[in-house]
């Protein structure tokens, strides 16, 4: 997908030429070439620190909060984590449009509650997906996860 298509609904400034993006990624170790690398500020690390290595690993463009002295196109936004979520929705074609979603929060009982709701919905004839800390399920298909709280990009990939 071209950067111009990807960013059509995002408040941003684009530096550099329009290019094709093969995937959206925020972990520089997972780059294979052609991706948009999202520089996300975290509690302990700032993804901007990995931008140079991401470009060396084949990132086609960067999502950043400030312009970096690198020769690839850059999408500059106020909040890269928020923009990554918007771009993932666009990239994966708005996969949740028209699909009911139930979110469960709290300290205790979330896993039990989700599996109870899943069982009830399936008995009622609905096809059910479940995103949880243990695993992700879409119908009978198990989708492994390595994070207890998936990032927006993983969620959109699973929803697709």
What are these regions (language model features)?
Residues 10, 84-160:
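Phosphate-binding loop of NTP-binding sites
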């Amino acid at each position: 997908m071209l950067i111009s298509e990807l960013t059509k609904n995002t408040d941003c400034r684009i530096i550099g030429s329009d290019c094709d993006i093969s995937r959206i990624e925020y972990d520089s170790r997972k780059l294979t070439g052609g991706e948009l690398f999202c520089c996300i500020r975290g509690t302990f690390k700032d993804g901007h620190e990995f931008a140079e290595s991401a470009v060396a690993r084949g990132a086609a463009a960067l999502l950043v909060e400030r312009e970096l002295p690198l020769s690839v196109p850059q999408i500059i936004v106020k909040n890269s984590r928020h923009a990554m979520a918007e771009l993932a929705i666009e990239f994966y074609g708005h996969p949740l449009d028209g699909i009911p979603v139930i979110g469960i929060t709290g300290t205790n009982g979330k896993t039990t509650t989700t599996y109870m709701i899943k069982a009830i919905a399936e008995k009622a004839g609905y096809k059910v997906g479940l995103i949880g800390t243990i695993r992700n399920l879409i119908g009978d298909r198990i989708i492994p996860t390595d994070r207890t709280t998936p990032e927006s990009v993983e969620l959109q990939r699973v929803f697709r």
